[in-house]
């Protein structure tokens, strides 16, 4: 026995489903702008030396990933700038400019150095982020639960779901006989909240991190900080990666490879087309021009035009 589908009112779509979507997008945009303002006004000083080191590491990794897209001369210039010139005492390269530092004998001191336990601004920023994600979600959930409680908002047009999804898709509706594919208003809000990350990234122009993952990370108690790798060891490993590269340009024979890809995707035989074009050109060159006949003989056969005098007036 098949169950007859429930016909939902159009007003539910206009006054429940669409308003939740619009308000959720507006709240996401406001949350993003407020978080940017809070980051600008935080005034946390940045270490210039560490910033330069991170930019150097990013530059080296980009070169390792995309070295075959630049000319060979440009690659060797960058390699000499980063790794230095072999046999030269003056040009040792940026990656060899930092000398190894004396490491602390106690590893716990190294682990807790430059961590959030010694830097109070890190704890402040973490609290600000948690507040910025927690307050809008609690407010939105209370708003939906107060104004739209008890509504069957929509039906999922998917394959039949199991009974395990009932507690997630029908929050606020206590009906055991209702099909699992029907979604309540509160569950519709949660579905939109979990699935709005990609839409916000496209419309707002920002790669936003999902709020649920940030709330999950903030709820977990932080453990001891991990030991940071010294910068000279990172430089040494990146230098080895550059020196292991054997340059092979991606632009070599790119025309032939492009034509091969087209041949694989299409059924055209370009060699046969070229032969046909050459044969057509040869045929047109072998055709002799026909002599043009003059039309002077036709002029002799033209009719004579006679002129008659008008009759005299009486």
Curated annotation (Swiss-Prot):
A Gene Ontology cellular-component term: endoplasmic reticulum membrane
Membrane side Lumenal: residue ranges: 1-14, 147-185
Source organism, top-level taxon: Eukaryota
Keywords: Endoplasmic reticulum, Membrane, Transmembrane, Transmembrane helix
Membrane topology note: Multi-pass membrane protein
Biased composition (Low complexity): 272-293
GO biological process terms on file: protein insertion into ER membrane by stop-transfer membrane-anchor sequence; tail-anchored membrane protein insertion into ER membrane
Presence of keyword Endoplasmic reticulum: yes
Subcellular location per the Swiss-Prot or TrEMBL entry: Endoplasmic reticulum membrane
Primary subcellular site in the record, as a coarse category: endoplasmic reticulum
Residue stretches of biased makeup (Polar residues): 294-314
Region of interest (Disordered), residue spans: 272-314
Chain ranges on the Cytoplasmic side, renumbered to this chain: 39-130, 205-314
Membrane-crossing segments per the record: 15-38, 131-146, 186-204
Record text on subunit structure and interactions: Component of the ER membrane protein complex (EMC).
Family named by the database record: Belongs to the EMC3 family.
Main function: Part of the endoplasmic reticulum membrane protein complex (EMC) that enables the energy-independent insertion into endoplasmic reticulum membranes of newly synthesized membrane proteins. Preferentially accommodates proteins with transmembrane domains that are weakly hydrophobic or contain destabilizing features such as charged and aromatic residues. Involved in the cotranslational insertion of multi-pass membrane proteins in which stop-transfer membrane-anchor sequences become ER membrane spanning helices.
Protein name (Swiss-Prot/TrEMBL): ER membrane protein complex subunit 3
Species of the source: Dictyostelium discoideum
Classification lineage: Eukaryota, Amoebozoa, Evosea, Eumycetozoa, Dictyostelia
